[in-house]
Amino acid sequence: MKFLFDLFPVILFFAAFKLADIYTATAVAIGATVLQIGWVWFRHRKVEPMQWVSLLIIAVFGGATLVLHNETFIKWKPTVLYWMFAVGLLGSVIGWRKNLIRAMMEKQVTLPDPVWARLNAAWAGFFAAMGVLNLYVAYQFSTEAWVNFKLFGSMGLMLVFIVAQSVWLSRHMPENSQD
């Protein structure tokens, strides 16, 4: 359910684009993200740092799109977010010797240190590649194709990557012996 809640602004962006245009969709995405953050705050009295980052990025890039009436800015938004994730994952290891993927998952999964390092690097590489791919689609295809890619293509690639990671991780997880 959290996954669908997190997709709320993207789904509304997609619907608004189909019903109107990129500028209406951008305004809807900004409003939906503000409402989403407000709801999270109302329910939990706490908002995750990444949700604040997402709000900041949609406000800046979406705002620039609306003020300057230039869709290029909103098309850069996913790339900036993906690259921030990639830099965050690699930077935390290089600068603070902290593996963020491990910090998020180690309560659910036990893995050897080298596997955690590869997993973190794989996610950083995935996000970096997704940023490049987003720009490729944004500049080589129509705005409509980019909007479709933003919802279906990027989510599909994320799902494929998660499944591939799960298969790869299953080979490295310790077996539970039941006597």
Swiss-Prot record:
It is found in: Cell inner membrane. Signal peptide: none annotated. GO terms for cellular component: plasma membrane. Coiled coil: none annotated. The gene is yciB. The keyword Membrane applies. This is Inner membrane-spanning protein YciB. Plays a role in cell envelope biogenesis, maintenance of cell envelope integrity and membrane homeostasis. Keywords: Cell inner membrane, Cell membrane, Membrane, Transmembrane, Transmembrane helix. Belongs to the YciB family. It comes from Cupriavidus necator (strain ATCC 17699 / DSM 428 / KCTC 22496 / NCIMB 10442 / H16 / Stanier 337) (Ralstonia eutropha). It is a multi-pass membrane protein. PANTHER family: INNER MEMBRANE-SPANNING PROTEIN YCIB (PTHR36917:SF1), INTRACELLULAR SEPTATION PROTEIN A-RELATED (PTHR36917). The chain crosses the membrane at residues 3-23, 24-44, 49-69, 76-96, 121-141, 149-169.
